[in-house]
Amino acid sequence: MAAPTNTNLTMTPYAWGMLVTLSIVWGGTFFFQEIAVQELPVFTIVSIRVLIAALLLWAVTALTGNKLPSDAKIWAALFLLALVNNVVPFTLIVWGQQEISSGLAAILNATVPLFTVLIAHFVTTDEKLTRAKFAGVIIGLVGVVAIIGEDALEGIGLAVLAQLAVLVASLAYTFGGLYGRKIQAMGLTPLGISTGQLLASSVILIPVALLVD
């Protein structure tokens, strides 16, 4: 493991505000999905979610004078990112929330940083494990085992499968985040990447929802 580097970890009030806002918005999706799964099928929920987001970001892209990529290779990369970072995790989480609460789903989804720390060590050159990171990962994983443990002892029922589905979704987010770096190196802005992958997700999910749901 590499020795820790000196990094400025000071956060400004603006950064804290952005973090709190993001937490509220991101956490709120679990609450609304818990309500939605009582009335709508899984693929319909996920399709509506990505379509609304895609249209909003498309509008922002147009209003700010930005353009979507025209290169076929970039779109191929965006479709792969959409699959790993949107389609798979969104579907697994919504499916899981048919059996577990929004709070538990959110807690399990918070394992993304744990998976990222571990996987980034092997696939990046600038994010190696330190002793502190490794200790944090171990503590986090012990917490996850403690959360799932009681249900798992009663057998692999739907509740356990739902929790495992959310964990697999977290793992997908990890690979999506790391792959997103490669796409950014193609010259796309964060707005372009987000808009492109959500449009691609809509193209993938809407036909599936129409056929399956």
How would you label these PLM feature ranges?
Residues 57, 116-118, 122, 155-212:
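Transmembrane alpha-helical segments that form core, pore/gating elements
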Residues 18-19, 78-82, 94, 106, ...:
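Residue-level signature of transmembrane alpha-helical cores of multipass secondary-active transporters
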Residues 44-55, 84-85, 93-132, 169:
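Specific alpha-helical transmembrane segments that line the substrate/conduction pathway
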Residues 25-33, 58-109, 142, 146:
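Specific transmembrane alpha-helical segments of multi-pass solute transporters/efflux pumps
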Residues 57, 79, 111, 119, ...:
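Hydrophobic transmembrane alpha-helices of multi-pass small-molecule transport proteins
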Residues 24-54, 95, 101-103, 175-200:
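Juxtamembrane helix-loop-helix junctions in multi-pass membrane proteins
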Residues 32-35, 39, 53-70, 141-157, ...:
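Membrane-interface helix-cap regions at the ends of transmembrane helices
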Residues 11-16, 38-43, 47, 70-76, ...:
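Juxtamembrane helix-entry segments on the extracytoplasmic side of multipass membrane proteins
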